[in-house]
Amino acid sequence: MSKNLFVGVDGKARKAKEFYVGVDGKARKIAKAYIGDENGKARLFWEKENTPVDYLEFVSNNSFTMSAPKLWDGTLEYNNGNDNGWTTWDGSEISSNVIDGRQRIYFRGSRNTVIRGNSASYSNPWKITGSNIECNGNIECLLDYQKVVAGEHPSMGRNCFKFMFRECSSLITAPQLPATTLAYGCYSYMFQFCSSITTAPALPATTLAEECYHYMFAKCSSLTSIPELPATTLAKDCYAAMFDDCISITIAPVLPATTLAEGCYTMMLAGTSITTAPALPVTTLVKWCYADMFWNCASLTQAPALPATTLVYGCYQNMFHNCSSLTIAPELPATTLADYCYDGMFSDCSSLTTAPALPITTLAEGCYKDMFSGCDSLTTAPVLPATTLAKKCYYRMFSGCDSLTTLPELPATTLADYCYQGMFGFCSFTTAPQLPATILAKGCYKEMFYYHQKLVIPPVLPATTLAESCYEGMFNQCYNIKPLALPATVLANNCYKDMFRYTFIDLSSTQSEEYPTPYRVPITGEGTDATDALSNMFDANGELFTGTPVINTTYYLKKGISIIS
C-alpha cells in the first residue's frame, strides 16, 4: 500500500504535495489520509512528509477542562473539535472533545511575546482539570505558530512562560522547549509541583538568561532524569533550584559550563537522591555560584573535587548542608578566602568524621561560619593557625559537634567582632582550649560554649581590655562549669551578661561554713562598672543568691566549688 498520494496531471501520475478534504463546505488541508481496505480496517494511504505541526496539543483518554488568566500580549486560539474550528480564546474554561479517538484541545497563538509575563503569579497558573494529560508539540506555537511553521523561533519576552503549569498534577508529559536563546525568567517555576511528570523535555538553549530555569522543575517528585544542559556560559541564577526536591532523580547531570555566573547553581540539585555529585572543574568562581547546590541530598556519598584557589563571597555557602551520607569532605586547596566562602558548607553532615585541612592564616568575614555545625560524628577538628581573626570567622563553626574530642588550639591574639561566637555550643568535651588574647572585641566570646553540659574546665581569661558583650552568655547552661577569676577592672557594656546563667555555680551574699570561698568581680582591685555589665551573670543558679552581682562586692562560693585562675 502506497504511503504517498498520486493524482493524474496532464495524463501522468504526479505525487501530491498537499491533500485537502471538504469539511462544512470548505477545503481543509490534512497531513494524513486513511482509506478502508478490503477487511474494513483503516489504512494510511497518504502522508505529507515533514508537515510542521502548527499547534500545541493537550490530549488524554479522559475528558478534561482548561482555563487560564489572560496574560498573553497577542492572540491565542483553541480548537476542541466542536465544529467551530479555531476560536479566539479569552482564557475562560473550555472542555475537551473526542478527536481521533481521544479527548483533545489544540492551541496556537499569533504575535505573542509572553504567555504569562510579568503579571504572572504563583497563584494563577493555567488550570487543567482532569487526569493523565499529555502536552505535545512545540510550546512556541503559543507565541506565533506561523513563525514556527516557517522554521523560526518566536522571540520570548521577560517571564514568558513563568508559573504556566505550576501545581498541574494531572500533566504527565511536558511540551517541547526548542528555543536556543532564552529570556529573563522565561521558564521560571514553569512545572513546579507537577508531580506526575516523569521526563523533562530537551533543553537545547546555549544562550541563557537570568533566572531562565529558576525553580523550573522544583518539587516534581516523579521526575527521574535530567536533560542535557549544553550551555557553556551561564547567567545569574539560571539553574537556581531547577530540580529542588526532585526526589526521584538519582543521577546528576554533566555540567559543561566553563563560565559561571552569580548564583548559577544555587540549590540546583537540593533534595534530590543523587549519590555522586557532578564534576565541578571551573576555577574562576563567582558570588554564590555553588551555594546550597546539594542542600539536603541525603544519598550523596561522594563530593566533587573543588580545585579553585581563589574564593569569592558565599561561593560554597551551605553547599553540602544536611548531606547525611557524606563521610569524606573534599580537599580545600584555596589559598585566598572571601567573606562567607565556607559558611555552613558541611553543616548537619551527620556522617562526616574528619574535616579537611584549613591551613590559611589570612581569614575573611564569616569564612568558616557554621562550617561544621551539626556534624555530630566529627571527632577531630582541623588545625586553625590564624593569629589575626576576622569578623564572625569561627561563628558557630563546631556548634552541635557533640562527638568532638580533639580540639584545635586557638592561638589568635588579635580578635574581631563575634569571631568565636557560639563556636563550641552544644558540644560535649570536658576541657576547653586556651584563649590567650588580652585585648578583646565586641561579642568575641559570646555564647562560645553555650549549652555545653559536660564542660568542667573553662579556659583562663587573662584579658584586661574588654569590649561590649565580649563574654556575654559564654558559659550559659554549662551546668558543670567552674567559676573564673576575672581580672579586668574596667568593664564594658554587657561584658559579663548571662555569662554563668543556668550553671551550678552557687553563691551566697554572706560567708559561712557552707559558703567559705570569697568571689568578686573584679577578682582584685577596684572595678569600674558599665551598662548591664553584670546583668543576670549568675541568673537561676543557687538558692541564696541569683541574678546580677554588684561590682566590687564580695560573694561566697559553696563548699567544693573552686576558682579557675
Where are these regions (language model features)?
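Enriched but not universal
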Residues: M1-S60, F64, Y556-S565
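Short beta-strand segments and strand-loop junctions that repeat across beta-rich extracellular domains
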Residues: L5-G8, E18-G22, K32-G36, L71-T88, ...
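Periodically patterned hydrophobic/aromatic "hotspot" residues that form packing/interaction faces
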Residues: L5-V7, E18-Y20, A33-Y34, F161, ...
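Small-residue-biased low-complexity repeat regions
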Residues: G8-G11, G22-G25, G36-D37, G185, ...
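Non-cytosolic beta-sandwich-type ligand-binding/adhesion modules
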Residues: V53, S60-I99, N541
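Structural signature of tandem-repeat unit edges
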Residues: Y55-F58, D90-N97, I105, I115-G157, ...
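Surface-exposed loop/turn motifs at beta-strand-loop junctions within extracellular Ig-like
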Residues: G109-T113
